[in-house]
Structure formats: C-alpha cells, structure tokens
Amino acid sequence: MTKTYTFNTIFYEATRRCNMACSLCMSSSNNPEAVKASRAKELSTAEIEKHILDTARQIGIKVMTWSGGEFILREDALELVRLATKYGYESSICTNGLAMTEDKLKAFHEASDGTLVIAVGINSIENENAWTRDGDCDLAQKVLETCGRLGIKRHCVVNVGKHNLKTLPKTLQWLVDNGIPYNRSPFTKRGSGCGHFAEYGFTREELEKYIHPELRKHANGYISYTPFFLDPELHEHFSKGQKNVTVPQSPSIGCFCGTWLAIGAEGNVSPCGILLDELDAGNVREKPLPQIIDESEIFQNVLDRSKLKGKCGRCRYQYVCGGCRAMALFHKGDYMEEDPTCFFDPKDPSEKSEHEEETSKIFKRYVFMVRHAGRNMVKKKD
C-alpha cells in the first residue's frame, strides 16, 4: 500500500434477505426480484473470512457492523460473529428485532466475547414510525430493553427526513432518557427510497429549523451528523492529531466517509452505507480490500478533504465536518461537491458559525462520556 490507513469500522450488508418489507428500504429488501438476484451473489462464509476478515486489519479495521436486510437470517450469522472475534474484531449487529430472541442475544453476545453492540432503527417513538418502517417501534424498544437487562450494549439509528420532523425532539429525548446512544442517518434516494426523495428528504431550511437544533442538544449522538461546527483546534487537542489521511479520528466526527467503509452483500465496496449501489469502488472477490482502498479514485478522493468543492472547500469546518457526501451525490451528482443541505455559507475559512461555541461545549461532554463509559455506551442519568 502507498499509505497507512486507519479506518475503524466496516458496515457490511451481509444479505438483502429480510423478514420485514419496509416500503422505503434502503437495501431494496422489500423487492423480491432484487433479493433473489442478490442471494445468488452473496459472499459465502469462506469468502467473507478470506476477502474481509483476513485483510481488513491491514487498513485499520477494529469493528465489524453486521447488517442487511436482516443479518441474523443468514444461517452462518453466529459463525461469522465467532470468526470476527477470532480475528480480533468487535461486532455490532443491526437488527429489526423480529427474529432476535433473548437466547439469540445471549449467543451472539458470547460469540463476540462480550463486545457486542445491538443496533435497531427507530425513526419515531410515536405512530409516525410506521411511515418508513414495517410497523411501530414496540419491537425495537423491546429489543433495547432486553439488551439493557442482559448488559448488552445498545445503539439506535434514527433515519431523519420530512416523515419525523415533528416527532424528532421527543424521539431523541426518549433515547437520552434511556441512556441509548444514537446516530442520525439522512433519508436518501438509495434503494426503495429512490422515488420518494422529494417527498421525504429534508431541505436545507428544514435541517436548519427543525433537525440541526435537536442534534446539537445531546451528546449521545454528537459525532454523527453534518454540518458539524467544531473548532478544528479543539479536535486536534483531544485527538492529538489522529487522522485517516485527512479525515479526523479519535473521535471521528462529521461525515463518516473516510473513517468507516461499506461492503454490500455481493462484495462491492463503497465509502458509505448510504452510497452502496450508487458508488462502487471495486469488489472484494476481484481485488483485495486494501488494494481497493489504495487504488480506488473514490476512496482517495474522500480521504483527501482538501479536494472538497464549493462552499465545503472554503469552510472553516472543511476537515472536522466534511459535509454529507451522500447528499452531495444525490442532489448534485458529484460526491465531492458541496453539501447543498448545509445552511452555512462561508465566504472564506476565517468565518465562524454562530453554533461553534455550543458544538465545542457538548463535544467535550461527548468525549468525556466515551472515554469513561466505553464504545457505544452512554450511562443513563440517575
């Protein structure tokens, strides 16, 4: 390799098979034809070990996030978690909860050697959850409660768009009150959401007025959104300058392109889970994963934030934020373009956002919690 890489996490959509049929599924798991075609090309157990687990350490990977579809529908799901542990990786499992029994939770927890994080999706804790998911949130809440009782670490993914603007404050507050860390994922046009992007995707104005104020409030999900108005020198201080090429790490902040990467069920590699099926850097069956990273123009671009265009390229927060690369692609057709949903319009890098002080203050709280509570775990308030 020409560079040393320090990626942290692989988001692996190990299958498109699912036991639900969410109408806006990002991985098209509600489309029987797409699932059938994908099933024939799914990486086998041996291929996953050879092409992913055996090579990912070379680019710094520490965590395997197993997703789908519904990952646990794979007959080898438990074996894959055991293999990941054998190779020294921690494991997270994204699940809808429908097939995740207490016995399975215990088995996966044991297979991960106690490192397991269970991630569920809750877009709203009210009835609006059913707009974008196949049912209400009771099932996900039950899984979270069971994990809490068993001492298994928990996480929540909140898909953000027009569908939950009104309920977002209550949803995030519920997660905070229950000590559950979360990340926001923007509604995009990948998969079955393609024809509904205009209907559900948030606008710049909605991000500024409704979404961003709520995301700024809570340290539980503090690193996982854009725009991220952190004082660059503050991150440099806490991270001691740790970067994956130019992408800030320890902790990772802003856009996660460049600190994690995604692999689809068929072996295609992308810099972001939202960009799978849209941005293909190569296939692990055809080329070793480290070589894909090293030779792919896509990865070499996203790892070098000096190449960002438009206002993202003249912004004080160019490196600590990076703008959402998915929004750049879906709105402007270029993953290195400016993020058009960002409401900050700097004239040059000297201009500060009015939210920098608030962002920096809660960032310090976030760093304190992570260093004292551990990965993906925030202690519940007394």
Task: Kindly give the residue locations of the regions a language model identified.
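Radical SAM enzyme [4Fe-4S]-AdoMet core and its adjacent flexible, acidic
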Residues: 34-38, 90, 111-256, 260-269, ...
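Short loop/turn motifs at secondary-structure junctions
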Residues: 6, 21, 60, 112-114, ...
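Residues at the N-termini of beta-strands
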Residues: 24, 63, 117, 181-183, ...
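Residue-level signal for mature regions of secreted extracellular proteins and peptides
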Residues: 11, 15-18, 247-250, 265, ...
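Cys/His-rich metal-chelating microdomains
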Residues: 17, 21, 25-28, 258, ...
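Conserved alpha-helical substructure of the radical SAM core
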Residues: 1-116
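Flexible mid-to-C-terminal extensions adjoining Fe-S/redox cofactors in radical SAM and related proteins
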Residues: 1-4, 274-382
